[in-house]
Design a protein with these regions (language model features):
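Intrinsically disordered, low-complexity terminal regions
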Residues: 1-10, 51-129
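Short, surface-exposed beta-edge/turn micro-motifs
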Residues: 17, 29, 35, 56-57, ...
Length: 129
């Protein structure tokens, strides 16, 4: 795998032939594309692609998941309004009413759909093959 330390800003892209861990944020307009998994230890607001070579078993995980788009293998999910700055989450879910940060989440493919759920040991045991 590969580690990238720093914030990816709009217009910047990071590509990896393996999995990638971003220690920082992926801002709106920035993109990460990995043949393996994508893990963002920060806020994910850009375009995140895992399994870029068609691997539907890859996943995307982030401490704060607010992406404009997630692609896993051949599957794509987009933000409900394309404006993650308004604290919208994928499919229109928003932060808690008291504006507390959301818990770390993971996006994965199941039954030909991309699902985003809070990371738990049980879930990791299910999706990591």
């Amino acid at each position: 795998g590969q580690f990238y330390r720093g914030t990816l800003r709009s217009g910047q892209s990071l590509e990896s032939d393996a999995s990638v861990v971003v220690v920082g944020d992926v801002n709106p307009g920035a993109s990460v594309c990995a043949k393996g998994n994508v893990v963002v230890l920060g806020c994910a607001k850009g375009y995140l692609s895992a399994g870029c070579d068609g691997d539907d078993h890859a996943f995307v995980a982030a401490l704060d998941m607010q992406p404009m788009q997630i692609r896993i293998g051949k599957h794509i999910a987009r933000s409900a309004d394309g404006e993650p700055e308004k604290k919208k989450k994928l499919f229109g879910r928003s932060k808690n009413n008291d504006n507390q940060p959301m818990e770390a989440q993971i996006a994965f493919v199941e039954d030909e759909n991309i699902y985003i759920e809070p990371i738990s040991k049980a879930l990791l045991n299910e999706i990591i093959v």
